[in-house]
Amino acid sequence: DNPFRLEYIDFEHPDHNIFRCVNQFVMEQGRENRRPDILLFINGIPVCIIELKNPTKQNATIHDAHTQICTRYMRDIPALLKYCALAVISDGAKNALGTTYTPFEFFYEWKKIENEDKAGKGLDTLRTLIRGALSPERILEILRDYVYFPDPTKEDDTTEIVCRYPQFFAARLLKQSIIKSVMEQTGKGGTYFGATGCGKTYTMAFLARQLALQ
């Protein structure tokens, strides 16, 4: 028999995939039964888990949403999260993106749909996160090019990192600039200024991989 490669997700043609958003999906594992608020599926594969909290309840916070995903679900239904790369926590006004392994303090708001947009505020931030990070085309791009798993032989093997929106747009622009420079043979392009602590190392990692595959 000749081996062949099976692509579960078609990253090049978004319309070739089946996208589903499921509310209160019931997951059973062992004796446990859990119902995440929202799950996003691509071709039957859970790729993003979303936990929502009611903003009118003072005791319900996005920190509680993080605990629900990264502690309770990870403990009780780990099989669901095995391929679920992204996680969103929200109370309607505060919304943040991370992974199922991201510590709470590193969850980050997604404030823009396109790079030239002004940063969203308040209730608009949830709409911005959905359109900016979770639309079919955008979530495919993030899953393909902006999720990083460190070498488990050198770092904690439970680490998983997803880009922040400034890293996403910076890597995109840098890639376009470098490709243009190569095509025109100008020797220019790829210049980037980032403030201290903005995550330039990961931006370069995301960019380097994309250029290597170009």
Question: What kind of feature is each model-predicted range?
Answer:
Residues 1-214:
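ATP-dependent helicase/translocase motor core
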